[in-house]
Amino acid sequence: MKRFMKLTAVWTLWLSLTLGLLSPVHAAPDTSVSNKQNFSTDVIYQIFTDRFSDGNPANNPTGAAFDGSCTNLRLYCGGDWQGIINKINDGYLTGMGITAIWISQPVENIYSVINYSGVNNTAYHGYWARDFKKTNPAYGTMQDFKNLIDTAHAHNIKVIIDFAPNHTSPASSDDPSFAENGRLYDNGNLLGGYTNDTQNLFHHYGGTDFSTIENGIYKNLYDLADLNHNNSSVDVYLKDAIKMWLDLGVDGIRVDAVKHMPFGWQKSFMATINNYKPVFTFGEWFLGVNEISPEYHQFANESGMSLLDFRFAQKARQVFRDNTDNMYGLKAMLEGSEVDYAQVNDQVTFIDNHDMERFHTSNGDRRKLEQALAFTLTSRGVPAIYYGSEQYMSGGNDPDNRARLPSFSTTTTAYQVIQKLAPLRKSNPAIAYGSTHERWINNDVIIYERKFGNNVAVVAINRNMNTPASITGLVTSLRRASYNDVLGGILNGNTLTVGAGGAASNFTLAPGGTAVWQYTTDATTPIIGNVGPMMAKPGVTITIDGRGFGSGKGTVYFGTTAVTGADIVAWEDTQIQVKIPAVPGGIYDIRVANAAGAASNIYDNFEVLTGDQVTVRFVINNATTALGQNVFLTGNVSELGNWDPNNAIGPMYNQVVYQYPTWYYDVSVPAGQTIEFKFLKKQGSTVTWEGGANRTFTTPTSGTATVNVNWQP
């Protein structure tokens, strides 16, 4: 959804007030810890569980797997869920303004110590799973996990779990004794291992060279045993496992390696979550510096999950850390991503994480990190702070970027930057939901405005550490008043004076200076800021967040279909819960009209699914093509494009599982229904349909299936 809104020209009498006096801060349902669908009002703190705090030494691994000194960063160091609980209870996280934590994958991992190039390695990171239905005992018991959920919720903190359904653990096709042979267990019962895989639980196509999307999906990541999601047992197992963690009360899911799993299976996986207990879900698809991937944005817009915004992270690092781009490049990223993401405010923004060098360098200027944090916390999206950033941790690539947290100081400037800015996401909807507009710029300085209705925040950053910036001609949407810097001057910010028409008085922004000024007011007409989940079947309750909905029930529209009465589960001024009506599957615009009939903005790209989803692999043989021509699939349901060649599924693959002239693709389709479908060849705008009658297939009610047919001339 594009959130550029018209500026208003309604001005008040001259006031010398800060925002705190202009508008009192009050709790709203959209900002509640119970809102599992919307994280735009939250600040996430990513915790590598083993490296955060050791709250229970009794659960530390023994022998070669453990290094209490944390000298070998590839061994366990002792961090656990009790340690996180302790740091919630003592106020370290809440004092920083953190309202969501993202923890390492909680499932049971392998116990083997693997020697790579003379260095012992363990599953301290949580990504070498063996049983997705049990806990990693080094982190804690199932009761410890429940205690973490309860403690976090009692302190208004949501809990996101990492989840890695792409693979189990390292394995060797030649040596079944290597590590644990990638074995997969179901609550303690062995399902199978990588060698002698008679049940076809895993892929066996060798390791990926990352040359194509297909190559990365169906071949192993390094030596990790790659799960076969087209296997019904694997499919049902993983979906049952995530339901178990949802039942335990998790509020969000980060899905690892989404680029390396079938997109159709992932859509059915998301449908399972959204049709069961929907929570905010985001995936990891790595992008390099200056990389813009159409497939990346298509996944974000069509899979039902958001993404870690690597495009944002890489550009922020270029501009604030490495000085390899300037503020015009930053502006271009913000404006370009606004177009490419259907819901830009749902993407998870960050400046570093466990898969890249830490932002701060050992001898680097701390102000660079502080400015990057301020930028992330006030920009569109859902900000995620990597543990230790507030303590200026440095470190190169894995494992040096995963060291033990050295301190829990609450007096660092970085901690205080987070502390002062994080609450804005709940108190000012311009930060949570607003559009972004550049208001003043040169190579080293950017002043941008976030705006939602008449709520406004203005952010000024001068990355030049030696030269002040003379700011003249600045015009904002702030009302006529004098505004104190929300940061309180800790980054050398200043007061901003705004006159008639939003014109700011000239001022000097100090070298390395950063300031935030804001204004809030109540909305009198409805404005939608967030909808979640963005994909589900009829009858599922979704959450609409925003402002100005009023206290009495109005109407929610899915396209032209009006929903009123009992199908509106709850209606408050900042949040509506509504059941998806019984409309045909497809893409819909959502809008709201309050009880007085005032209409909201349109929130677009909502997908109504035809029903519950399963994954079907469609295989077409003998489909020869000309150079530049590809094979696609369409059919009579929205999941297959409703017979529209422009919305057909594909291009299909033809290199790994099957080879040309056989093509294949894994597709999410309605469960337990007889569907019609056909294949077609496309080259640009030229479409060639296969002959014969429409094909039919009755999909399974659960699990997966394969359709294997020949091209009809």
UniProtKB/Swiss-Prot annotation:
Could you tell me the keywords of this UniProt record? Calcium, Disulfide bond, Glycosyltransferase, Metal-binding, Secreted, Signal, Transferase
Q: Which residues bind substrate?
A: Y127, W128, H167, N220, L221, Y222, D223, R254, K259, H260, H354, D398, R402
UniProt region (A2), positions on chain: 230-433
Give the co-factor note: Binds 2 calcium ions per subunit.
| Signal peptide residue numbers | 1-27
Q: In which residues is Ca(2+) 1 bound?
A: D54, N56, N59, N60, G78, D80
Q: What's one GO BP annotation on this UniProt entry?
A: carbohydrate metabolic process
**Region named A1:** 28-165
Gene3D superfamilies in UniProt: Glycosidases, Golgi alpha-mannosidase II, Immunoglobulins
| Residues the UniProt record annotates as site (Transition state stabilizer) | D355
Q: Where is the IPT/TIG domain?
A: 526-607
The reply to whether Repeat figures as a keyword in the UniProt entry is no
Which residues does the annotated region (C) include?
A: 434-522
Cite the active-site annotation: D256, E284
User: What residue stretches are annotated with the CBM20 domain?
Assistant: 608-713
Q: Which reaction does it catalyse?
A: Cyclizes part of a (1->4)-alpha-D-glucan chain by formation of a (1->4)-alpha-D-glucosidic bond
| Region feature D, mapped onto this chain | 523-609
The set of disulfide-linked cysteines is C70-C77
Region annotation E: residue ranges?
610-713
Q: What is its EC number?
A: 2.4.1.19
**Sequence segments annotated as region (B):** 166-229
Record-annotated residues binding Ca(2+) 2?
Answer: N166, I217, D226, H260
Q: Which Pfam families match?
A: Alpha-amylase, Alpha-amylase_C, CBM_20, TIG
Domain annotation text? May consist of two protein domains: the one in the N-terminal side cleaves the alpha-1,4-glucosidic bond in starch, and the other in the C-terminal side catalyzes other activities, including the reconstitution of an alpha-1,4-glucosidic linkage for cyclizing the maltooligosaccharide produced.
**Protein name per Swiss-Prot or TrEMBL:** Cyclomaltodextrin glucanotransferase
What lineage is on file?
A: Bacteria, Bacillati, Bacillota, Bacilli, Bacillales
The gene behind this protein is cgt
